[in-house]
Structure formats: structure tokens, C-alpha cells
């Protein structure tokens, strides 16, 4: 219970850090699912890009909202963890983010995609996105501690 209160206090005192982490996460998402791997990601997900006149911002709102919640929770938990362990340098922040990503996101994606019969490339693309995002958020939180 004490740590839940501490996470809440962290969120209140580090609003700017969380907002920066959110913006960085959105930036990575737009690059990853756009110019870097957008065509491949759409191919894996069997998505036909809508015509330019049919594209609406509202189509992205569910995903953006889910990402908002994820980044707020991840930032609060990572930030509080960083306070507890008193990090010596950014490498420790990146290591902790990787350790948390591996069982809770990376392997969850692998297990889910394996059962769904998805291609290994699809698995790697999505798991890689989350790893890069976790690492970027960890770096932002470390720099703004």
C-alpha cells in the first residue's frame, strides 16, 4: 500500500516527466508504424490503408488512448522504481526497463503470437516497438529525475 501511495506522489510531482515520456512514446509510435515499418506492419496485420479522403484522426483515438494509459502507468511504476534503487547512471535505468519489458511485454507477445500462428517477423516488429518505447521512456525518466 505504501508503494501505491508513493507511485501516486511520484505522478503528482513528475507530471512534466510523464508528459515528455508520453510525447516521446507517441513520436516513436508514429515513426515505427509510419515511415520506418508502417507498410510491413500493415501487411502483417492485413490492414488496407484507407484512401486519403477516408482517413480520420478519430480512427487513431482508441490506440492513442490505450497508449496514454500505458505510458502513464509505466512511467509511474518505472519512476518510482528508479527512486527506490537510486540509479547511478542511465545504463541502470535502461537495464531495469529491459528486465521489466522481457517477462511482462516481450514474452507475453511471443506467447500470444505463437498461439495465434503469427509470423516471427510480426512478433519481432511488435516486441521491438515496445522495447524501444520502454527504453526511451526509461531514459526520459532518468534524465528528469
Q: Predicted segment positions?
A:
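Juxtamembrane/disordered regions of integral membrane proteins
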Residues: 2-145
Amino acid at each position: 500500500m505504501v508503494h501505491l501511495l508513493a507511485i501516486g506522489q511520484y505522478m503528482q510531482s513528475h507530471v512534466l516527466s510523464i508528459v515528455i515520456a508520453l510525447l516521446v512514446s507517441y513520436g516513436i509510435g508514429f515513426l515505427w508504424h509510419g515511415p520506418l515499418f508502417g507498410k510491413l506492419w500493415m501487411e502483417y496485420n492485413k490492414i488496407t490503408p484507407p484512401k486519403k479522403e477516408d482517413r480520420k484522426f478519430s480512427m487513431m483515438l482508441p490506440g492513442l488512448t490505450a497508449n496514454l494509459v500505458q505510458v502513464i502507468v509505466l512511467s509511474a511504476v518505472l519512476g518510482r522504481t528508479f527512486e527506490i534503487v537510486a540509479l547511478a547512471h542511465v545504463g541502470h535505468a535502461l537495464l531495469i526497463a529491459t528486465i521489466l519489458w522481457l517477462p511482462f511485454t516481450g514474452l507475453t507477445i511471443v506467447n500470444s503470437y505463437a498461439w495465434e500462428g503469427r509470423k516471427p517477423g510480426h512478433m519481432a516488429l511488435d516486441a521491438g516497438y515496445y522495447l524501444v518505447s520502454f527504453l526511451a521512456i526509461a531514459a526520459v525518466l532518468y534524465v528528469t529525475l
